Amino acid sequence: MMSKLKTLIRNKFRYINQIPQIAHYIQNDYKSPKVNLGQIQSAANKYKKGIKNLADVEFQVFSQFGDDGIIQWLINELPIPNKTFIEFGVENYKEANTRFLLINNYWSGLVIDGSIENVNSIKSEQIYNFYDLQASCSFITKSNINELITSARFDKEIGILSVDIDGNDYWILKEINRVQPVIIICEYNSLFGYEHPYTINYKDDFVRGNDYPFSFYGSSLRSAIDLTEKKGYGFIGCNSAGNNAYFIKNDYIKYLSIPIVSAKEGYVFSSFTEAWDKEGTPLRGMDKIRAIHHLPVINTDTGEIERVDAEAIINSLQEAKKMKRF
């Protein structure tokens, strides 16, 4: 009986000594098979010519949606002189637009997050030693963003700037003047539609979900396009999930096999939901827009405070056939 008990315990815990190795493998996912699959997909993307839109080259390794594929396609199309990136709002950097770029293409970069726990987590990973990565802990504001960028000591023309802070994105991007990225990736809020120049009002300590519904944040695609046009960029489209917009510096547009598009042409309504009813059931289609009805926004054309007109946005998206469900 005792012998059987010993055998049972031994079999039950025979892998206990391997736990450190398993944890190490999971943590160091730059060695994982998904990276190898991403490398194969990236190689295939090099031969994709005459694509109709960015969705044709999407694939996901570490990005939240298909942005890894879009980025790989763009850096193969464009003669980017400085292989550098800046991304903020990365949390622990496990899911990010530039992580695969860092690992696969050996770019150098700066990542910024407002949580010291997240930044310490990044610095504890082997990729922080194996690759040229800087991680800075700071809650980004209009007054500190340029100094944070300057501290990275990159040339003014960096390769990619990725802006995703779930809130003051428009105001922070507007403030940045220390770098001129070849590619700008900026999160937009599709619930504002494509016609309205809307953004949330700037607030230094804005935290998504604190004062308003979780789905009320960021800016409209129209506002992001207007802002980047003034900075010398052309809009080439959005990812198919409907949360990231892509802008290319005008000097580099000629190298692309796809054209600049209008807000209406490039707009994508978000496929995911970040809005719920009182019972916690996810809202879909037009109900996501109605969840932010009459909330205060800034019209980036006039600078005036307006109120979200959900029905006007819904009507324009229906007319343009931009919604899969109503």
Language model features: what each stretch is:
Residues 104-105, 179-180, 231:
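Short, structured coil segments at secondary-structure junctions
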Residues 160, 183-185, 244-248:
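Conserved hydrophobic/aromatic beta-strand scaffold that supports enzyme active sites
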